[in-house]
């Protein structure tokens, strides 16, 4: 029996849930009231940061299985997360949180360029901008504030990575220990926004010694936060001095169907595992040794318009496993400057890494997003 809460009237989950409440997942007490009324046995936030503190809050109030509210709250607030990193011996960029544009503008001398400006409480790179000069700092701050529910932004020095792709994906924690290392390459499209994820691929292109450093960092973080179970979405980089820098860590599964991709790689149902953990049930899923060469790509447009169709090249069609469209002809399409403007997603399986790299590095040649003018 599944109860779903959301403030969006068009949430597609309402058609498969047993009960739907038009309640915002950020309204902790309203969700608690629903949970009490329905006498739920577990509560789970999925694929988005804002609902995660609510799930932990309700879990603690009703004495249900949950990760500590204080830990979840740290992970969902970027300035608190940066403070946690600094206080616990992890690498953290020079950063500062602000509640007004004026305060941030007056404090730029604190930082070395490039910097990244972003809301403290958003995910999917919504509201984030990288600045290589201070010329457009006002625009970047206004953009970041427009995506912050708490009306608070963070400015931090931007860490340059030594490897080709940001390290991302999901890990799965059971009894405090990471049991699935779903680390993936994070792909970007610099034509639209170098910060917004456009896809993931596996296997991870990283030296084994660096993989070990990443794993040690994440397990240590789970220990210090007291994270006991569930999916944790991660983003990290390693700099030229071989230092691991955690960029974002979210106490929930990743968006863009990351659990589905990891399911193919590990032969395990990570969604089922997350639900079982949240219910306090034993996890009986068999997790296989990771195998294969897989990728996802978020279908997107470089401009605004009216959706007509998306055409794939014959070469790409050889490797397509699944295609999911979110738009239909006639729908309005916006330039892909944040993850919410995705047009759909495709899953691919390749025979080897070389083939995957060849296709994934030239996706604009293999996908034709056809629009009509507005």
Predicted regions and their residues:
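Conserved ATP-binding module of the ATP-grasp superfamily
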Residues: 91-93, 114-117, 129-165, 194, ...
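Active-site "cap" helix and flanking loop/linker of ATP-utilizing ligase/carboxylase catalytic domains
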Residues: 212-234, 240-241, 250-305
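A conserved helix-loop-beta module that forms one wall/lid of the active-site cleft
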Residues: 60-127
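Short, well-ordered beta-strand elements within core beta-sheets of diverse protein domains
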Residues: 129, 157, 203, 263, ...
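Glycine-rich active-site loop/lid that clamps phosphate-bearing ligands
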Residues: 299-331
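Short beta-strand-to-turn element immediately C-terminal to the catalytic PLP-Schiff-base lysine
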Residues: 98, 128-133, 172-174, 239
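ATP-binding N-terminal substructure of ATP-dependent carboxylate-amine bond-forming enzymes
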Residues: 1-71, 102, 280-284, 301, ...
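Beta-strand scaffold of nucleotide-dependent catalytic cores
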Residues: 129, 139-144, 156, 165-187, ...
